[in-house]
Regions:
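Short, extreme N-terminal segment that most often corresponds to the first beta-strand
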Residues: 1-42
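A short linear-motif detector with a strong N-terminal bias
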Residues: 1-3, 44-46, 79-81
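Short amphipathic beta-strand and strand-loop transition segments with alternating hydrophobic
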Residues: 3-13, 50-58, 104-105, 113
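Structured domain cores in non-transmembrane regions
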Residues: 31, 43-54, 58-64
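Surface-exposed flexible segments
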Residues: 33-44, 110-119
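Charged interaction segments
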Residues: 62-132
Length: 132
């Protein structure tokens, strides 16, 4: 026996809300990196890419951390909601201010896109004539 299909609205919600999220956090101490990764994982998903860049003159003094991952937004959730929640989670875990920059990129097909190829397009492509 086959399993019943999920409601259509849920399928569309999942298919149409795929985003790449890139968060940059600066100035971090090296010991704070695991806390930021944990906050990112709790709010969004486990990062697929983690990049650390030392800033300032002395290595190990301060860092810029960039985390990148792709994931689905939940129903009725907006990218701004994720950015807000992630920023506050990082501040709460560190118990101090750090600059957080979040970039979201929509990865799905445009929900407003509609393509229709009729007689006019066929005639242009192949030089055909249609008579009614």
């Amino acid at each position: 026996m086959t399993q019943p299909l999920a409601p259509i609205r849920v399928q569309f919600a999942k298919a149409g809300n795929h985003y790449r999220l890139e968060a940059s956090v600066s100035r971090l101490l090296p010991r704070e990196v695991p806390q930021v990764v944990a906050a990112f994982t709790e709010v969004w998903t486990k990062p697929e890419e983690v990049e650390c860049l030392a800033v300032g003159g002395v290595s190990g003094e301060a860092m810029i951390l960039t985390l990148i991952a792709e994931h689905e937004l939940r129903l009725n959730e907006r990218p701004a909601d994720i950015a807000h929640a992630l920023t506050y989670a990082i501040w709460q875990k560190l118990d101090r201010y750090v600059k957080v920059t979040v970039e979201t990129t929509y990865l799905g097909e445009s929900p407003d896109a509609h393509f229709e190829y009729g007689e006019d397009q066929y005639a242009k492509a192949y030089g055909a004539r249609f008579e009614n």
